């Protein structure tokens, strides 16, 4: 079987087993998390929900933009004046959790400082339900918030986990 998202877009995959079956997890350029049966390539039954975009399967997909907490259009994504975000490395699976990093505007000479924060998202590997979100720029009441000036958490986001993630499954 073959699964194609976009030509020349190979960021890698995450892999796990559920009830003895292999599952492949992919983050797409449009910031969707897709779970596929590793043997058949079919969308994983019971994972995610209906994405409000024509042509998507009824199961096997999570719209991660919805979990970032910013207004967006399912067809167009986040308005470019608000920011830009995509997946730049594969998701990782740690125990029962699929963890997804992302990338904001790419390159060393970014055109602006305003952007959507590249928060790290974690999903249940069985259902696709959001388990937690790590705010890369601390919000009020979170550890380290006072070290960010000018309410940076509200308007800047050129902080993200663009490189491949790693984790210690025992801790």
Regions found by a protein language model. Name each.
Residues 1-5, 42-80, 129-137, 143-155:
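Aromatic (tryptophan-biased) beta-strands that constitute blades/sheets of beta-rich domains
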Residues 6-32, 83-110, 117-119, 152-171:
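Repeat-blade elements of multi-bladed beta-propeller folds
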Residues 36-38, 110-111, 146:
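Short acidic, glycine/serine/threonine-rich loops at helix termini
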Residues 36-41, 115-130:
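Beta-propeller blade signature
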Residues 38-46, 162-164:
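Contiguous hydrophobic segments
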Residues 106-108, 139-142:
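Flexible loop/turn segments at secondary-structure boundaries
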């Amino acid at each position: 079987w073959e699964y194609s998202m976009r030509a020349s877009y190979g960021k890698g995959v995450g892999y796990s087993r559920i009830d003895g079956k292999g599952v492949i997890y992919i983050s797409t350029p449009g910031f969707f998390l897709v779970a596929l049966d590793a043997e058949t390539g079919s969308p994983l039954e019971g994972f995610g929900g209906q994405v409000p975009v024509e042509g998507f399967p009824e199961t096997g997909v999570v719209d991660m933009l919805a979990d970032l907490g910013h207004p967006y259009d399912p067809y167009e994504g986040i308005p470019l004046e608000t920011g830009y975000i995509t997946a730049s490395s594969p998701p990782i699976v740690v125990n029962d959790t699929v963890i997804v990093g992302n990338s904001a505007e790419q390159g060393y000479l970014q055109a602006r400082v305003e952007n959507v924060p590249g928060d790290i998202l974690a999903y249940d590997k069985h259902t696709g339900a959001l388990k937690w979100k790590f705010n890369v720029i601390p919000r009020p009441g979170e550890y380290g918030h006072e070290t960010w000036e000018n309410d940076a958490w509200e308007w800047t986001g050129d902080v993200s986990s663009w490189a491949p993630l790693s984790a210690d499954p025992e801790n």
